[in-house]
């Protein structure tokens, strides 16, 4: 399974940083990372709601994690009302200073790097700020964001600059996302590009057998269906028949412990802390929208905590999907507007020059098959018989469903999507 995501924000002339440079890092504040994780969750659900309302009949796939981290870079460089607006959208009300957030951000990066070295699943997330080489970058930004800062020549080497950014994205996503930026998207007027690239490649803890993958119907309505390659297996998985969400919630774990270290006779969650969570509503016209309206960070947490091991037959479509999103209108609906407005944007912690975010893009790609899934992103049938969902013997994803790639350790929604119609998805 391959999953990839890229978030990009291009900055044009029209940024200041007291909050980042005014206070030294305090190692005692690093435990605030738990608040950062909760903010990421709330942001993820808010972004999902905006996107699904904008595309009510389409398939959806994106990485809220990637977008959140690209916006964190903007937040670290912002000041004044721009900073306040970003803090609200990123759910940073718990932090009394920008340095608290940066400390949590640094610890998250350290923890992610340490965990990656100890597990077979590949998950990486990289942040980068590409500055114009003639743009004055504050000494504070160079010191505090040293790993993220790179200066390039947008003005006289425009095409080479575009290639540099695209090459960085391709490298971070293991060549899954190439040519993110087209020829007209970097110009001599570009002053700065904020980027995050996320990549995940994982094997199912319990793999589907290819010989059991057969053509089966996927229903988009009671009278309309398409044949899909349906993967099937029987096993013990964590399941919650969720009355609050009015859906069945199943966790398909990835292998995050090397086989030599796996515990024998363990529960489904002991050898994995990253899963694809499948949220399957009943099959009627408004059930998916009903579930989405009930979903938030707390309801997702509660549902996952209440799950119990069940022996169950699972059917899941095999699919591959890529989505490109223009983030400006999505972020505007979430409450981000000032950083795009040249007349009011302030990024004083990065530079003394007046600049604003000109454009923002997100690309996400996922492949799900019998072995597992690969994802990358870059940010430049059952029915209710009563009010309670029926306990299933089968979990058949043969009608529209929601999926979330969830990291239990950090309580992060890494990727999320809605599978509505297989006609527009590669199988």
From Swiss-Prot:
Cell location: Secreted
Residues marked Reactive bond (site): 386-387
Phenotype of the disrupted gene, per the record: Larval lethal. Larvae develop melanotic spots and display an increase in the activity of the activated form of prophenoloxidase 1 (PPO1), phenoloxidase (PO). Larvae display enhanced activation of the Toll signaling pathway, with increased Tl, spz and Drs expression. RNAi-mediated knockdown of maternal and zygotic expression results in adults that have a reduced lifespan. Wing development appears to be unaffected, however after emergence from the pupal case adult wings fail to unfold and instead remain folded and hypotrophic until death.
Single GO BP term: negative regulation of proteolysis
Gene3D superfamilies per record: Alpha-1-antitrypsin, domain 1, Antithrombin, subunit I, domain 2
Expression (tissue specificity): Expressed in nurse cells and oocytes. Expressed in wings.
Glycosylation sites: 224
Protein name according to UniProt: Serine protease inhibitor 88Ea
A cellular component term, taken from the record's GO annotations: extracellular space
Highest taxon of the lineage: Eukaryota
GO molecular-function term, one example from the UniProt record: serine-type endopeptidase inhibitor activity
Keywords: Glycoprotein, Immunity, Melanin biosynthesis, Protease inhibitor, Secreted, Serine protease inhibitor, Signal
Functional summary from the UniProt entry: Serine protease inhibitor with activity toward trypsin. Negatively regulates the Toll signaling pathway and suppresses the expression of the antifungal peptide drosomycin. Its negative regulation of the Toll signaling pathway also results in the inhibition of the melanization immune response via the phenoloxidase (PPO1) cascade. Essential for unfolding and expansion of the wings after emergence from the pupal case. May regulate the Toll pathway by blocking the proteolysis of the Toll ligand spz.
Cleavable signal peptide: 1-18
Family: Belongs to the serpin family.
């Amino acid at each position: 399974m391959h999953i990839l995501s890229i978030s990009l924000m291009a900055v044009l002339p029209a940024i200041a940083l007291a909050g980042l440079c005014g206070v030294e890092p305090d190692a005692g504040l690093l435990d605030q990372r738990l608040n950062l994780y909760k903010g990421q969750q709330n942001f993820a659900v808010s972004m999902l709601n905006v996107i699904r309302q904008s595309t009510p009949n389409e398939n959806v796939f994106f990485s809220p994690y990637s977008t959140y981290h690209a916006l964190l870079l903007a937040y670290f460089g912002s000041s004044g009302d721009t900073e306040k607006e970003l803090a609200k959208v990123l759910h940073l009300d718990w932090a009394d200073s920008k340095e608290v957030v940066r400390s949590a951000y640094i610890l998250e990066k350290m923890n992610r790097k340490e965990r990656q070295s100890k597990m077979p699943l590949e998950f990486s997330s990289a942040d980068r700020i590409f500055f114009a080489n003639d743009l004055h970058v504050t000494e504070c930004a160079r010191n505090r964001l040293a790993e993220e800062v790179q200066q390039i020549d947008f003005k006289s080497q425009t095409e080479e600059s575009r290639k540099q950014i695209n090459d960085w994205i391709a490298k971070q996503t293991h060549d899954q996302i190439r040519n993110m930026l087209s020829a007209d998207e970097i110009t001599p007027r570009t002053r700065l590009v904020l980027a995050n690239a996320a990549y995940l490649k994982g094997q199912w803890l319990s793999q589907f057998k290819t010989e059991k993958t057969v053509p089966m119907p996927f229903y988009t309505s009671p009278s309309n269906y398409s044949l899909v390659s349906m993967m099937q297996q029987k096993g013990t998985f964590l399941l919650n028949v969720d009355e609050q969400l009015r859906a069945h919630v199943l966790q398909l774990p990835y292998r995050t412990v090397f086989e030599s270290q796996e515990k024998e006779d363990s529960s489904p969650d002991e050898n994995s802390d990253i899963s694809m969570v499948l949220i399957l509503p009943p099959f009627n016209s408004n059930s998916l929208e009903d579930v989405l309206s009930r979903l938030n960070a707390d309801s997702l947490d509660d549902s996952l905590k209440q799950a119990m091991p069940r022996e169950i037959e699972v059917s899941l479509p095999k699919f591959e999907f890529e989505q490109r999103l223009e983030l400006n209108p999505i972020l505007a609906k979430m409450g981000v507007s000032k950083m795009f407005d040249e007349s009011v944007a302030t990024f004083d912690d990065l530079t003394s020059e007046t600049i604003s975010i000109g454009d923002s893009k997100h690309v996400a790609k996922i492949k799900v098959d019998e072995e597992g899934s690969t994802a990358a992103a870059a940010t430049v049938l059952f029915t209710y018989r009563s009010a309670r969902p029926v306990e299933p013997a089968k979990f058949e994803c043969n009608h529209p469903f929601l999926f979330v790639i969830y990291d239990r350790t950090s309580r992060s929604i890494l990727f999320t999507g809605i599978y509505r119609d297989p006609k527009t998805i590669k199988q």
